[in-house]
Curated annotation (Swiss-Prot):
Disulfide bonds: none annotated. Coiled coil: none annotated. This is Uncharacterized protein YjfJ. One of its GO terms (molecular function) is identical protein binding. The keyword Signal applies. It comes from Escherichia coli (strain K12). Residues 1-18 form the signal peptide. InterPro entries: PspA_VIPP1. The lineage of its organism: Bacteria, Pseudomonadati, Pseudomonadota, Gammaproteobacteria, Enterobacterales. Keywords: Signal. The gene is yjfJ.
Length: 232
């Protein structure tokens, strides 16, 4: 009963472990799906980052052109003033320079906002990529641990089966030895009864007491006979 109880308890344990293994497997699959989803979103963010970098470059180039245009007009306006050119023309140039300055101010603000967004996106993309890489590494560790534990569980199951077989064999051997001992005792008792029946048991008892002759030769008898022959 003890062995059966132990096996029953162990069986319940294995069932519980199997249920936990199923839950862990499902958990691993869910984590893998989350990682795939995160990588897909990261790819989208990467494409948005490329678009943002392109907009930053376009804004930077536009600002450069505006500044170069403003500098060129300022130089020509100074030259016009030095040559006493028609004031209306100089005023027209001044108005264009003022318009360019307003455009430059607005574009500088646009570029600043774009650069802030770019820096934030780059940090987020880098951090997310690092986290995904860490999760993937941890996932490999989880898979390796799960495989190792499954192997250990298989070994444990085999060991329990072997222990049960050994216990059964030991009990069978003990029963066999007991039956053989009982059989030998019955044979010895039968032989003793046979000796009593034909008188051999009594003769053996008298011989042990030194009464009566014995047809058996002993080493002492042989040695005494040889000594007598030598004296003759």
């Amino acid at each position: 009963m003890g062995i059966l109880k132990s096996l029953f308890t162990l069986g319940k344990s294995f069932i519980s472990q199997a249920e936990e293994s199923i839950e862990e497997t499902q958990g691993v699959r869910m984590l893998e799906q989350h990682i795939r989803d995160a990588k897909a979103e990261l790819d989208k963010a990467g494409k948005s980052r490329v678009d943002l970098l392109a907009r930053v470059k376009l804004s930077h180039d536009k600002l450069k052109d505006l500044r170069e245009r403003k500098a060129s007009l300022e130089a020509r306006a100074l030259e016009a003033l030095s040559k006493n050119v028609n004031p209306s023309l100089i005023n027209e140039v001044a108005e264009e320079i003022a318009r360019l300055e307003n455009l430059i101010t607005a574009e500088e603000q646009v570029l600043s906002n774009l650069e802030v967004s770019r820096d934030g996106v780059e940090k987020a993309v880098t951090a997310t990529a690092q986290r995904i890489a860490q999760f993937e590494q941890q996932m490999e560790v989880v898979k390796a641990t799960e495989a190792m534990q499954r192997a250990q569980q298989a070994v444990t199951t085999s060991t329990v089966g072997a222990s049960s077989s050994v216990s059964t064999a030991a009990e069978s051997l003990k029963r066999l030895q007991t039956r053989q001992a009982e059989r030998q005792a019955r044979l010895d008792a039968a032989a003793q009864l046979e000796k009593v029946a034909d008188g051999r048991d009594l003769d053996e008892k008298l011989a042990e007491a030194g009464i009566g002759g014995s047809n058996k030769s002993s080493a002492q008898d042989v040695l005494a006979r040889l000594q007598r022959q030598q004296g003759e």
